[in-house]
Regions:
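Intrinsically disordered, low-complexity Pro/Gly/Ser/Thr-rich segments with frequent PxxP/GP/PP motifs
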Residues: 58-84
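Asparagine-centered strand-capping/turn motif at beta-strand->loop junctions
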Residues: 33-37
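Short, solvent-exposed beta-strand/turn "edge" segments of beta-rich domains on protein surfaces
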Residues: 17-26, 67-69
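Low-complexity, acidic Ser/Thr/Pro/Gly-rich terminal tails and inter-domain linkers that flank the onset
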Residues: 1-22
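Short, hydrophobic/aromatic beta-strand segments
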Residues: 38-54
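Short, solvent-exposed loop/turn segments enriched in Ser/Thr/Gly
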Residues: 13, 23-30, 74, 87-91
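Terminal connector regions
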Residues: 82-111
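Short beta-strand and strand-turn-strand segments in soluble, beta-rich domains
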Residues: 10-12, 50-64
Length: 113
């Protein structure tokens, strides 16, 4: 997970880490997603029920194409919080098979103004 910091640069943020994004600035991320499971992940266009999305605070970011086991994609310029933050705010990233289940690890970052 990389988040654009207050200086406008991409900053790698580890699970449980923090980043200063600037007060009121949109929180924008670049997410590298790897399928470590047994089955291929399908995009919503191929599987409206069960297609895979990354979720963050109620927002959903669908994967753009099929990801085979051990495959990887990068979701560029994902706006996690359009209105930014005014105080330290945790953001939890998860995976969801649309309409079926939330799965995989929880990845949490704290965004500060």
């Amino acid at each position: 997970v990389e988040i654009r910091n207050a200086a406008g640069e991409w900053q790698d943020v580890p699970d449980g880490g923090e980043v200063a994004a600037g007060a009121g600035k949109p929180v924008v991320a670049r997410l590298t997603v790897t399928n470590l499971g047994e089955a291929a992940w399908l995009p919503l266009a191929e599987a409206p029920e069960g297609g895979v999305c990354v979720t963050a605070g109620g927002a959903r970011f669908p994967i753009p194409n099929r990801i085979e086991k051990f495959g990887q994609i990068v979701l560029e310029e994902v706006t996690l919080m359009p209105d930014g933050v005014r105080q330290p705010t945790p953001i939890e990233l998860r995976f969801e098979a649309q309409g079926r289940a939330v799965f995989g690890p929880r990845y949490t970052v704290v965004v500060r103004p």
